[in-house]
């Protein structure tokens, strides 16, 4: 047994994000990143289903996307179960959390053993190759001799492509990348930059040191973060995950209100708009406000940090300024500007109309800040930017195909393309799946993968949901993945490793049974 053998974590991390998941966490004594930085006592979160067969070669590795976790049941639940693509009675299923994610593996919210405080912005950058090498250590400790197939979409698809190149030759038998690319495009890099700038522009970001509260003597509070910036970044990301047609069909120009906290029981039927929400202004409240006040409120609708209205250009103080911050806090609440009529101009008394699409984005942004960390978001989007399958691994401790890829700092575009073609030629048999309406990882990028991998099949799934189709088109994806595995690996379908009668079956069918915590799938995308 080597000195670097993972050991179970004895004292669970107090990280509130990791506590959202029932999973296992192992500690790796030492791990060196592609950058050359060595990390000590590295926590790695993972989850498994099923069990290994006698040959220990029936492992299915599932790789999560940017904001996902090791809990496959949460974001790909309809694909996991008896007689489904990810069948625990036939396969030993493993999913590891990536470096930089707040859900258990080492990240910005992990306590730095040298300082006793979270790594924060001082967490060293990582690559997709690092994730593969880290998870390989865990797989070997679990007794896995070889992997039947690696499956994943988006960032998870990048991990899938790197697996055969960053583990010993022959360790991975087949791969199934979905909605991904061989190298991160300029389009995706630009969207990632825009999202990071949203976080940086939040005054609460504090260069990433927002965990420490100065007025409380440097006390660490992981719940403290630049929530407005992170919410804005999430909103921008959601627009890249869906398609124009998807938003138009679901929302159109319909009014929307969103979830709000209001007392149960009672309805106002006189003195103002009929409502069950006590925060909605009455007729007298609205009448007391000046036209300039109403214009100010409409202009700042959705601005989460709007305080008291400043003094006007004329030097006078509007009614809002005199009434103080409490009154202003009221007018910027989402529930205060629910569908209260059709007046949008500043001259009317009705609050500004909020479109359903706006309300959806605001709700999703707020929801995201409760389950993800801003520094972690920055870390992982930068990880995505570094993705290039043709880049050789700097690690020489493990004999892998990636470490043998040609490298030249002054390579021309033609040489870079040749390196990519060479890297793809080293991949094992593959089922490449794309989403027809995906504007983030286009079908042309899926064609590039399939054309470069020697034994590859390409499937394009029609879906109006854009990139998120890989998380929503469960039935189609299940059918193609299971069918391909049966053709390529019939031996795993000749006998089971777990008696079906002993397996606790979850929900049947391919519909979304519950709202996902870590994925994009919603039981009803218009419910919020």
UniProtKB/Swiss-Prot annotation:
What controls its activity? Inhibited by 6-carbamoyl-3a,4,5,9b-tetrahydro-3H-cyclopenta[ c]quinoline-4-carboxylic acid (CTCQC).
Q: Name one GO molecular function term.
A: homoserine O-acetyltransferase activity
Pfam families named in the record: Abhydrolase_1
The knockout outcome noted for this protein's gene is:
Methionine auxotrophy. Attenuates virulence in a murine inhalation model of infection.
* Domain of life, source organism: Eukaryota
Give the UniProt subcellular location, in the record's own words. Cytoplasm
Any single GO BP term: 'de novo' L-methionine biosynthetic process
Entry EC number(s): 2.3.1.31
Compositional bias (Low complexity) spans? 389-409
According to the UniProt entry, where is the signal peptide? none
Question: Key word 4Fe-4S present in the record?
Answer: no
Compositional bias (Polar residues): 273-282
Predominant location category: cytoplasm
Q: Which NCBIfam families match?
A: homoserO_Ac_trn
Q: Per its record, how is this protein called by name?
A: Homoserine O-acetyltransferase
| Gene this protein is translated from | MET2
């Amino acid at each position: 047994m080597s000195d670097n053998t993972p050991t179970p974590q004895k004292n669970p991390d107090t990280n509130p994000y990791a506590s959202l998941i029932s999973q296992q966490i192992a500690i790796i004594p030492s791990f060196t990143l592609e950058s050359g930085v060595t990390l000590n006592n590295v926590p790695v979160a993972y989850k498994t289903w099923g069990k290994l067969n006698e040959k220990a070669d029936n492992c299915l590795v599932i790789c999560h996307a940017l904001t996902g976790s090791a809990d496959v049941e949460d974001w790909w639940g309809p694909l996991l179960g008896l007689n489904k693509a990810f069948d625990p009675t036939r396969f030993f299923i493993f999913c590891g959390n990536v470096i930089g994610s707040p859900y258990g593996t080492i990240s910005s919210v992990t306590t730095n053993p040298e300082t006793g405080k979270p790594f924060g912005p001082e967490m060293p950058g990582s690559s997709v190759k690092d994730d593969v090498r880290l998870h390989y250590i865990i797989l070997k400790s679990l007794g896995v001799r070889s992997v039947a197939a690696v499956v994943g979409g988006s960032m998870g698809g990048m991990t899938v492509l790197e697996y055969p190149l960053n583990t010993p030759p022959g360790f991975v038998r087949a791969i199934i990348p979905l909605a991904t690319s061989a190298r991160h495009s300029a389009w995706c890099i630009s969207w990632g930059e825009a999202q990071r700038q949203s976080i940086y522009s939040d005054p609460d970001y504090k260069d990433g040191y927002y965990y420490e509260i100065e007025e409380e003597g440097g006390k660490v509070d992981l719940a403290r973060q630049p929530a407005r910036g992170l919410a804005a970044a999430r909103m921008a990301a959601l627009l890249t995950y869906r398609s124009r047609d998807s938003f138009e069909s679901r929302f159109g120009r319909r009014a929307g209100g969103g979830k709000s906290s209001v007392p149960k029981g009672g309805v106002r039927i006189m003195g103002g708009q009929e409502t069950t929400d006590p925060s909605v202004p009455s007729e007298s409240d609205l009448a007391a406000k000046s036209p300039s006040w109403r214009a100010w409120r409409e202009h700042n609708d959705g601005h989460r940090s709007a305080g008291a209205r400043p003094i006007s250009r004329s030097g006078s103080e509007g009614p809002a300024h005199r009434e103080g911050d409490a009154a202003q806090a009221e007018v910027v609440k989402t529930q205060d500007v629910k569908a209260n009529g059709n007046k949008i101009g500043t001259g009317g008394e009705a609050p500004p109309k909020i479109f359903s699409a706006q309300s959806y984005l605001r709700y999703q942004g707020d929801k995201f800040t409760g389950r993800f960390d801003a520094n972690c978001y920055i870390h992982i989007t930068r990880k995505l930017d570094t993705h290039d399958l043709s880049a050789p691994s700097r690690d020489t401790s493990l004999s892998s195909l990636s470490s043998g890829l040609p490298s030249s700092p002054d390579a021309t575009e033609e040489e870079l393309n040749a390196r990519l073609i060479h890297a793809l030629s080293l991949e094992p048999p593959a089922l490449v799946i794309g989403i027809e309406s995906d504007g983030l990882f286009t079908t042309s990028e899926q064609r590039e993968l399939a054309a470069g991998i020697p034994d590859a099949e390409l499937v394009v799934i029609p879906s109006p949901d854009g990139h998120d189709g890989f998380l929503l088109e469960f039935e189609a994806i299940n059918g193609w993945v299971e069918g391909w595995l049966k053709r390529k690996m019939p031996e795993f379908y000749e006998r089971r490793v777990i008696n079906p009668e002993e397996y606790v079956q979850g929900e049947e069918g391919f519909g979304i049974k519950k709202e996902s915590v870590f994925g994009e799938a919603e039981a009803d995308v218009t419910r919020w």
